[in-house]
Amino acid sequence: VNRPTPTPPTRLLAIDAGLRAGLAVYTADGRLERYRSTNFGAPSRLKKGVYGVMSAVEGLRRVVVEGGGPVADPWAREAHRRGLSLQRVQAGVWRKALLLPRDRRTGRDAKEQADEIAREVIAWSGAPRPTSLRHDAAEAILIGLWGVLDAGWLPELPESLQPG
């Protein structure tokens, strides 16, 4: 009996690009599945590591990267090579969508607020709770949240995640 192979669930990978990068994976229902911080340590290891990170995300369809230049370009190249939807976003864009103006006055304020909201996203999504949460992972979580909203995977921010 030939049974159709089930298609893997669609996923989005969000990256706070850097040699120390934050990574977050979201499912098509707009919920955070997993997140982490990784230290590539050197540009050569970043270039090699991008392939493995993307290969580990089953059903990857969309990539959202914050950052530019040599730390973001390997992510863009690999996404294009795989035929994935790629979106680059600047911090100011996702912060404006997810943080109140008072929480965006300084980069430090924004990072503190990102950490708080990331923990709320983790709880709302039912993702494993962090023992510690690095700011790059927290920012990747919010980059991904912005990405699923932008893609229409979530029609709007869940009430518990709305600023204010």
Where are these regions (language model features)?
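Phosphate- and other anionic-substrate recognition elements at nucleic-acid/protein interfaces
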Residues: 1-164
